[in-house]
């Protein structure tokens, strides 16, 4: 399993809306994530800085990256772009984080 972590931003006035849209997440998006080998996906909110910290375990980078081209992912990005900064393709602006410590 490959552990990944990344950080995103959420608009200051959209914390509750961001959480509402994820609870529950669309069943078809959950299915696509699982079918592409995503496990233990969690997102945490830092309210003070409007930051989202996400962690996920994946089976392969190729399968993880393929999620972006699915119809449901494209629709999800459009659904979320009004509550967080987005790239021109509607994907959330994000930065991958380097793991510097892990205790199993």
Swiss-Prot record:
- GO process terms (BP): rhamnose catabolic process
| Compartment(s) of residence | Cytoplasm
Copy the pathway line from the protein's UniProt record: Carbohydrate metabolism; L-rhamnose metabolism
Q: Membrane-crossing residues?
A: none
Keyword Lipoprotein annotated: no
Mainly resides where? cytoplasm
- Binding positions for substrate per the UniProt entry: 18, 41, 76-77
Q: Which reaction does it catalyse?
A: alpha-L-rhamnose = beta-L-rhamnose
- For this protein, the Enzyme Commission number is 5.1.3.32
Active site per database record: 22
Q: Does the keyword Translocase apply?
A: no
Q: Which domain of life is it from?
A: Bacteria
Arranged from A to Z, the UniProt key words for this protein are: Carbohydrate metabolism, Cytoplasm, Isomerase, Rhamnose metabolism
GO molecular-function term, one example from the UniProt record: L-rhamnose mutarotase activity
State any GO CC term.
Answer: cytoplasm
Entry's family note: Belongs to the rhamnose mutarotase family.
Q: How does it assemble?
A: Homodimer.
Function per UniProt: Involved in the anomeric conversion of L-rhamnose.
Q: Would you tell me the protein name for this molecule?
A: L-rhamnose mutarotase
